[in-house]
Amino acid sequence: IKTLITLSYVVGFDETTLRAGPAGTKRYVLSAVTELYSLFGLGGRDLGSFRDFDILPDFAGIAVHDRYQNYYNEGWTHLAAHQACCSHLLRDFTDAAQAYPDAVWPEQAQRALRGLIHAFNQARDTGQPEITPLVRDPLISSFRHAVRVGLAQVPANPGPRSRTKQPPGRVLLEFCRDRETDVLLFVTDTRIWPTNNISERGLRPTKTQQKISGRLPSEIITQDRLDIRSYIDTMRKHGVDVLTGIRDALTGNPWQPPLPAPT
């Protein structure tokens, strides 16, 4: 499964907290998923854990993720491109709208992004390789204008960037300006998801289990559980009956995902 994920064109990356191991420690479940494969691992949110998860070091496709800085580390310059999760951006613009209730730019940016996502879904559902320029260009222009207005209305606080707290929304606006390609990559290629919802769905059972079971005392057993979940989730994505797949695995005839067709 890990190899097939690293060979994929697009992979979604996400992470969520998990209480595992000794009391007082916080771990993360890391995920790397595609429409056909899922992989979950236990680690931290640091670069070392990202490397040990062993997807990003060998993956050369397009990574879909949130704005977390470690996804933009110089160690991953071999990636083909990034797609920022637009669901996260929409939530961030909601926060900005609450911080600046009289401002127009947060809602304008949201309308533009939602319009592009809707156009993406329509294009993909009808087999189009991209959103047509006639549809996307006005929405992109509206998004850019919203970002420019926001930058003008929310000036940066002076001082060293690493130590100076910025006003609400300023970092978001700078991200959308400086990494516009990462925000809007999906508009010219319908193979690229505009959101990372597929990764968030994959992590949801982990949070549910946490609410039921509480802290998981053994990190080793927790990783074993995540390995099993990776296998079951991948089976499910291939239309394999889960109970049948588990039975076959226990009787020595495990299902294996098919190799991708040569291109």
Residue ranges and their predicted role:
Residues I1-T263:
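Catalytic center-proximal scaffold of phosphoryl-transfer enzymes
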